[in-house]
């Protein structure tokens, strides 16, 4: 399931987000994208509230990065030939005429331009983006613990003991349709059966029909606690 945009095609949106307005869709995409992007390629969240579509947001970010404000005459900034060639070609509308670069550009705007051009847009696997997002949030909240991925499950460990497991599930879950996560539920109970920890959370994107957790009980009544949890895609740590 892809999420992003491709030049000449337009935006590609997972069905779970298809009913959102432009601002909320952009806000969610930027939050997910920033978890997968390097520091210089991240997009400030303020761009989501501009009312622009995803492609326009990235082009606006490039234009803003290309502006040189209040240059200091007392400092000599490093000059990157590759970056200059890319930015000049972009500004003149002749990017296709730029020959292959022997070195990678250093300027953030040039890096974004090259990324957009090489991929004909920005489009990621939504499952991977969501998993990385959940991992980053858990690691930030539990900074004093060892947080790691193992077999598709995020574990938090302290003192050599697993405390809980979190399984990202990029599906449109509701109280009436939580069977869509049957595969993840089975894997969760299987992991709990090992006895190394007693709490498992299967997290899926929050939606209008999935705003409270769902407790899932095993038929035999044993095997630890397992919950389906609505996960908010936000820059906040909670």
Question: Model segments located where?
Answer:
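Terminal, charged accessory segments of proteins
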Residues: 1-120
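Catalytic core segments in nucleotide and nucleic-acid processing enzymes
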Residues: 118-238
